[in-house]
């Protein structure tokens, strides 16, 4: 088998050994685990050697070759001079095409005992195997080293010697499989054309997955060097009485083939030049293997070693070369309000290893792990999709009529609808006017009219019921005074905002607790102990937010303790809101359900009294004894 045929076979075998043949190649769409094409890493890069033949002056050198029957031919001699290209044998000759330029070689200076050949790479690469073809007899001893930190530290790949034990004190892999030293490639025959072959993933390495941590540790390199430690003579020289020994005292190498590929963790099938790298132009130096991956599977980095900025919802993983699983990075759910996210292991574990992405620097006035809610001082505009940049609108609470939250100097609105918390006697979604029966819009809200009827909302002067009067005092327009530096708060916190109080002209004839049979005869749907949190004038009706502290009775309704909304009889029906429910106070309320809407109604048929423990015990006694 010829030299070229041997090289082709070795390249194919090494690709199989590296476990890469089952992975999608450069012509695939990289839908599964994939890898860039393999090639000679020495092509287009500078090979360094300590010396070169004729580097100081013209030198005469000789070499032997054998016939097919291993009989010696007469030596051939020639001259070398590094200053003349047709007589030079530089290190770059080892990295030209072994097929197009098979008879070019590097040669050391005469009578050199130790020599070094080194390849420096501009990035991390996957190295699979080395093939060296010598023009001189192969060394009696040499070492192949690698570096993974750009030459700061080195680690041996393999020792080569005619006698491993005598030279290095190591066992021979000819005797012990997997030993780090071998005598397979140290025979002086053939005197020219002898090969040294090293496979980075020879047994005992498990090569099922070429992207596993163990395999990466074995294959990743930034530098590769060969230390030639001991020359040996061609046996033909012993029988040649006319030979001059010093003419044969050199190392010479035809080819230095470093087979490998761009290192992409199984997430790319093509690579680009590393920034700043310029390949060396040399005869036959085609198809340079570059080192910067064109990442797929939502990965990023020179080696696809981390997830792309908005794809950190699961931990980054290398692709699985055994199963072909791409292990894609997954997009974070940021609702269109963030450009980047990060992976949080605590969030990941709390979700049962389903989602760990946390959005960074939420935009468009949003906040939260997924930018899923509006910031304090903004509310959700339900007319816009939440992914829209203008989905969160600034609160427009009037700075005078709106209530200030405890421990804060800023007024916030309900983030779900933009409603503002009003001061006592103030009404409107933006708290910008006095309620009916109130006057004097100011820093303390609005004051009740001190009249039998209504009053002027500006002056408080009593007016007759027949007067043509504007019941609402509109306040001039204003601009939001939201301060973004204020601390955030939760709307659900218990607050005592303004109540919807009746005016002086309104009479609320509320139910009293008298005859138990009359109380039971009302057939109330619910009986509750509540605390008034806030009340809101909606124009056509009112809503009272309460905290249910105890459920004394609940028929068909499923009422739980917690926050709920009550719906008093509309002021448009009576000119005021009845019964009276003031914020911060506790009441015992018995009422009915609106069968059409399921709302809890409070009207003139309802029983509403300030809560007292004795009242609660009495009502419970009636419910258990009489209302059965």
UniProtKB/Swiss-Prot annotation:
It comes from the Eukaryota. Residues 506-627 form the NTR domain. Expressed in kidney, liver, heart, ovary, testis, retina, brain, olfactory bulb, and widely expressed in embryo. Glycans are attached at residues 56, 163, 353, 483. Residues 1-19 form the signal peptide. Its main location: secreted. It is found in: Secreted, Extracellular space, Extracellular matrix, Basement membrane. Disulfide bonds join 262-271, 264-293, 295-304, 307-329, 332-341, 334-359, 362-371, 374-392, 395-413, 397-420, 422-431, 434-446, 506-576, 520-627. One of its GO terms (cellular component) is extracellular region. Residues 30-261 form the Laminin N-terminal domain. Residues 262-331, 332-394, 395-448 form the Laminin EGF-like domain. May play an important role in neural, kidney and vascular development. Promotes neurite elongation from olfactory bulb explants. May form a homodimer. This is Netrin-4. It comes from Mus musculus (Mouse). The lineage of its organism: Eukaryota, Metazoa, Chordata, Craniata, Vertebrata.
